């Protein structure tokens, strides 16, 4: 059996007579968490889930529990905690709290010591029989608690070293050496993000018995309400246009990322989609921390998980396993070869939301946060009304939520609040998250103290305490896909999942990296070579299983790709389609007694046939025939990335018909666009002339189409040449052109047959000039 050396324990409030002088209480086992949240992200880093007072500057309600003491007496009370800003040599201790016993706070204020997790002596208490414990937050700034230890031995000092702490934990909790096991499942899926959901649902619809394991209380991973990254990537296209149909049954239709209301990410819909599969067992709040290998082969026999709320340990036995953890955790525990950049990788984001209230809101001083000036970070942006962003993923679908009124009252810090580029992508994750906290709190402090009246009435409504990582381990398969194959369009015989996202890697944004060069917290997206956005590049099946472990699949950002390719494949709708393919391949493995590699070598035609079937198709048994249920969810047609100029009224001059001067690049990333692409440039002296002639003299409205981006020009000069003469207006292309994708440049007089034009220039634009299309329509 292989276990993470940092692990762990059953999380029970319990007393054992054989160790009556010492009582261990896991914070996670408190019966009422109050306003404290359960953090499970860093179990491999610090040894346990823990509770955190994430009140964003407002004290949270007490976490409470009751224990029974069998030996009365005077107990020394220890609490395992951390001053979370101390590793940064920051001033103060923001996460202060106390432990209350029977309504009486102990003398020591906790969360103030050390640079790592350690035991702080909270005080002493006279205990006899029943005792009520409470964690009393003092600040709302992320105080954290792993465990409480009571001892009658006044000379006992619990160990701070992690391995010794966990040895003590296991001894005092009386953990069995071997956890009980489940029945044997056909497929065990570990990780409940989009890739895991795709694999679990797809496998269940093929008649497999599926154990679906997720270490959070909700499904969706980065696409859940806890993280609020909207799911990107084109589905239902390419070689196998039915791939993605399962994903679209549960994908979000959010208006913003993050949104004014986290409910836009529709956790309920995701759970309903999973629970609708009768052959699947869902295990939420279960963290996999170990594997048990088969004795006679390099295969996994079971994965070992613990319930992060009740502490129950379980071995999940299966024939085949899917690593959808995002970190390649199962593969690494099993000994699979993997790739990982220790430095120079993409970071982790913790996004945030502000809301304007009807009165002034005070904000505490934060001397421990990053000392920021207004120019040290991008100001949070106003949210857009429903339908301006993410429109393609909304078209034809039930949104699944009621749009938030008064959207203009919300501001948000988006995906680019990202750090950890040169930090170890696994061991340093808690430090990365906490650095993000310091950046966000420091930014809000700057807005409050230096932003004038604009931010007086704003309050912090939401800050993700669960981070959204982008890159860590990638398990090596029989093929490592490189980015150049995508660009060249090299199609492999097992190409299947269409990846449509351009090769998008993140780096520190130089403008904001000057003050904190060792750990920048604002990123920029660098788009490399383009992929075929219309049809997608088909990612090979051989990237979806381990070359070393005979029964291990993977799906999501942990598949077998090099970094440039990862920049394209990592987005969530694409990851979900990988899961769909893996679920089908797992059925072939079970039904035909083969391996993931054997599917490619012997049964590829069967896999191709399955990928050509609608996602709603299912079979009731392993041997049963596929059929389409009468109640199968009907999906709307795929919304086009581009607007068809032939279907638009008036005169349409697309960017490909414009007369371009200077260096212009083509793009497809900002959707929707008119025609097959758009063009953009910031080259000095570049220009674009959209020439046209009307058939009838008269007054015409002139419209310019574009999609916004932060790097687009804020003052783009646009000249309209008409019978009235030349008029120049400026366009802010960093903002949306309008709900319909265009901005009216004005109404002008044009003479029939006379050449007129709209001219864009880069000089003075303050960013990239975006060319999509000009529309000239009668003003009658």
Model-inferred region functions:
Residues 21-176, 641-780:
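Extracytoplasmic
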Residues 196:
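N-terminal Rossmann-fold NAD(P) dinucleotide-binding loop
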Residues 181-193:
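Beta1/beta-strand and adjacent pyrophosphate-binding region of the FAD-binding site
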Residues 16-20:
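Sec/Tat signal peptide C-region and signal peptidase I cleavage site
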Residues 2-9:
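Sec-dependent signal peptide recognition
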Residues 208-209, 214-294, 339, 346-349, ...:
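Conserved N-terminal/central alpha/beta ligand/cofactor-binding core
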Residues 203:
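Aromatic pocket-lining residues of Rossmann-like dinucleotide-binding sites
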Residues 176-181, 297-302, 312-320, 324-643:
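Flavin (FAD/FMN)-binding glycine-rich loop and adjacent Rossmann-like elements that form
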């Amino acid at each position: 059996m292989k276990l993470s050396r940092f692990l762990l324990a059953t999380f029970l409030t319990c007393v054992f007579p054989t160790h009556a002088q010492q009582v261990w209480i896991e914070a996670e086992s408190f019966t009422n968490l109050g306003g404290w949240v359960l953090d499970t992200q860093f179990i491999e880093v610090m040894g346990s889930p823990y509770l955190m007072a994430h009140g964003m500057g407002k004290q949270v309600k007490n976490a409470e529990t009751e224990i029974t003491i069998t030996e009365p007496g005077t107990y020394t009370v220890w609490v395992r905690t951390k001053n979370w800003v101390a590793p940064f040599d920051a001033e103060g201790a923001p996460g202060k709290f106390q432990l209350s016993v029977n309504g009486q706070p102990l003398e020591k204020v906790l969360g103030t010591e050390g640079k790592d997790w350690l035991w702080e002596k909270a005080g002493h208490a006279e205990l006899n029989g029943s005792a009520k414990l409470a964690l009393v937050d003092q600040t709302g700034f992320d105080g954290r608690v792993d465990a409480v230890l009571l001892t009658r031995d006044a000379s006992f000092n619990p160990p701070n070293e992690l391995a010794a702490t966990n040895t003590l934990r296991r001894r005092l909790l009386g953990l069995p050496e071997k956890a009980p096991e489940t029945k044997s499942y056909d497929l065990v899926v570990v990780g409940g993000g989009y890739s895991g959901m795709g694999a679990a649902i797809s496998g269940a619809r093929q008649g497999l018995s599926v154990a679906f394991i997720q270490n959070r209380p909700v499904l969706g991973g980065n696409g859940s309400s806890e993280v609020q990254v909207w799911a990107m990537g084109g589905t239902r296209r390419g070689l196998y246009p039915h791939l993605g149909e399962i994903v679209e049954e549960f994908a979000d239709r959010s208006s913003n990322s993050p949104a004014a209301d986290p409910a836009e990410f529709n956790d309920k819909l995701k759970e309903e989609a999973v629970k609708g599969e009768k052959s699947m067992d869902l295990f939420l709040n279960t963290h996999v921390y170990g594997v048990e290998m088969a004795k006679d082969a390099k295969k996994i026999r079971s994965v070992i998980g613990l319930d992060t709320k009740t502490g129950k340990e379980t071995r999940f036995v299966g024939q085949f396993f899917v690593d959808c953890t995002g970190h390649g955790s199962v593969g690494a525990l099993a000994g699979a070869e993997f790739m990982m950049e220790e430095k120079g990788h993409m970071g982790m984001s913790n996004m945030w939301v502000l809301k304007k209230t009807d009165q002034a809101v005070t904000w505490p001083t934060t001397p421990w946060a990053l000392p920021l000036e207004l120019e040290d970070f991008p100001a949070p942006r106003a949210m857009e009304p429903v339908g301006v962003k993410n429109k393609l993923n909304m078209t034809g679908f039930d949104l699944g939520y009621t749009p938030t009124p008064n959207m203009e009252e919300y501001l948000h810090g988006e995906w680019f609040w990202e750090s950890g580029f040169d930090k170890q992508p696994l061991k340093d994750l808690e430090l990365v998250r906490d650095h993000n906290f310091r950046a966000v709190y420091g930014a809000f402090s700057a807005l409050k103290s230096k932003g004038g009246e604009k931010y007086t009435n704003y309050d912090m409504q939401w800050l993700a305490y669960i981070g959204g990582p982008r890159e860590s381990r990638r398990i090596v398969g029989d093929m490592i896909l490189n980015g150049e194959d995508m660009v060249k369009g090299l199609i492999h015989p097992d190409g299947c999942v269409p990846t449509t996202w351009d090769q998008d890697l993140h780096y520190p944004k130089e403008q904001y990296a000057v003050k904190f060069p060792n750990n920048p917290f604002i990123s920029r997206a660098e788009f490399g070579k383009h992929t075929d956005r219309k049809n997608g590049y088909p990612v090979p099946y051989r990237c979806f299983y381990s070359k070393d472990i005979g029964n291990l699949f993977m799906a999501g950002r942990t598949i077998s790709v090099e970094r440039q390719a990862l920049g394209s494949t990592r987005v969530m709708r694409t990851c979900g389609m990988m899961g769909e393919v893996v679920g089908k391949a797992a059925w072939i493995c079970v039904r035909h007694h083969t391996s993931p590699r054997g599917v490619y070598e012997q049964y590829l035609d069967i896999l191709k046939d399955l990928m050509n079937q609608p996602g709603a198709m299912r079979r009731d048994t392993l041997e049963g025939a596929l059929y389409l249920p009468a109640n199968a969810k009907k999906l709307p047609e795929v919304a086009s990335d581009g607007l068809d100029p032939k279907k638009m009224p008036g005169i349409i001059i697309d960017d490909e018909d414009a007369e371009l001067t200077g260096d212009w690049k083509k793009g497809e990333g900002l959707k929707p666009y008119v025609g097959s692409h758009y063009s953009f440039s910031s080259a000095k002296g570049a220009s674009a002339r959209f020439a046209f002639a009307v058939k009838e003299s008269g007054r015409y409205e002139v419209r310019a189409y574009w999609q916004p981006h932060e790097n687009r020009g804020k003052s783009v000069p646009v000249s309209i040449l008409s019978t009235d003469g030349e008029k120049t207006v400026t366009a802010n292309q960093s903002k949306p052109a309008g709900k319909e994708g265009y901005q009216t440049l004005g109404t002008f007089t044009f003479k029939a047959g006379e050449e007129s034009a709209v001219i864009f220039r880069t000089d003075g634009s303050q960013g990239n000039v975006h060319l999509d299309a000009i529309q000239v329509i009668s003003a009658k």
